[in-house]
Amino acid sequence: MSDAEKAFIIADLDRHGPLTLCDSCYRDIPYRRTDPISLELTDESRSCSVCMVRTSKPEAFTEPFCTFLRENPTVFHAVGYFTSKLTSLGYKELPAREDWTGKLEPGGKYFVTRNGTSIIAFTVGKAYKPGNGVAMIAGHIDALTARLKPVSNKPTSAGFLQLGVAPYAGALNETWWDRDLSIGGRVIVRDESGKTSSKLVKLDWPIARIPTLAPHFGVGMLGQNNKETEAVPIIGLDNSDLGSSGAKPVETLGPAGSFVNTQPPRLVQLISKELGIKDYSQIVNWELELFDLQPATVGGLDKEFIFAGRIDDKLCSWAAFQGFLASEANEDDGAIKLVALFDDEEIGSLLRQGARGNFLPSTIERAVESLSVKDNKAFGPGVVGQTYANSFLVSADVTHSVNPNFLSRYLDNHAPRLNVGICLCADSNGHMTTDSVSTAILTRVCELSGCTPQVFQIRNDSRSGGTVGPMLSSAMGVKAADAGLPQLSMHSIRATTGSLDPGLGVKFFKGFLDKWEKVDAEWQ
């Protein structure tokens, strides 16, 4: 695969138009195998869409990131996107339930998923030897949302159909009121033969809204409302009770005990139609959630911003993934390059697909075991310990951009700006992994990669958030640092980042994976 073709696939350039190409890339890219696109030819590589991606120009990644946000609203869709991208680039999936012995080799490209909501991808250096280190980036792809309850059907209230939902992490806060909410997620289906499968679904129009109460009623709407009784989404109308006598019969869509009988009938019918399901009882269960439908967009006088939902943390996870895909593969690479994107960070990471589970260490250890067998080297605790001692983790999570309306909330010289670069994040109480050694390592990476690092630490009178870094670095004993991209309005249903920040992230994460072995050698 040529570098031009790789860049074309990485950034989804077949989805955008018009596509400006230099003559060289026009000959190399596989555009003839994609959907029709509008092409503009240029003699200058600096304006060629593919060349801009190949050279990590930040502006080349703005629209691809916005498209990713628009098309992948749930964690299930995000993992599906990453899986599709890896497969198209020749990565081999490693089923967790199978034996990996003999399946891995130096120069190989692999990925493994867990629960359809977490994914780990890695490449093995062509010069890899058992005991060599892993250059890894870890982040999370879950975001604040409102998930349907196990029984989401609710009695009609004053003619309104409502939906039973529960907040995931800090969702249903005041920013969720009066928003156009759609629905998506995973549906478990059993067909006529008894085979069970998982199907992804999302609707492209709003089906729900949480209405505020007008100020005329004298009740404030400043976030002090009851999330169980006052933040219940409305999804339709049913005024059939007007003028009727007696109770309305309960509508059922399946046999007694069917899952679909616990959900709003009209929603079941709608989801079934989207998935082409005729027999509603084939729906065994589902994990659906609400999301803000307003699309990600660029804004500002010179389009300096991205306004979008779910920036925390699709931003760092997408940039890390793209940086990983764009990283170089040289003959003398001796390390494993890896990106791990987890679910459940916003609620503590304690589930098996979260960073506190064994997903990352077990994947690394199984990979090292397979590679040791390939190299005829005995595998055991010694090789595992040596691997971790030679490794480094970048914990990638969004951090707080300085807010011009609240400057006093930030420490001097610790106030990151948008469209500048990656932030090295510190915390004296161990909520971040960064120390003097890891800071020096990443600062050197920035120097070699042409990146501008920023620094963030929260004030002593404010509460620091946490990341997956401490739990992963302590579990494996690896050196680590926290580094993330800045955003405004964290944990709002709609946030802001810089239009160059996705691309600046790609440049940094690619630089870390490409330069880490060189930097690590300077410490030996």
Positions of the model-derived regions?
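N-terminal hydrophobic/helix-forming segments and targeting peptides
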Residues: 2-26, 40, 44-524
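Short, non-ligating residues that shape and space the ligands of small metal-coordination modules
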Residues: 31-32
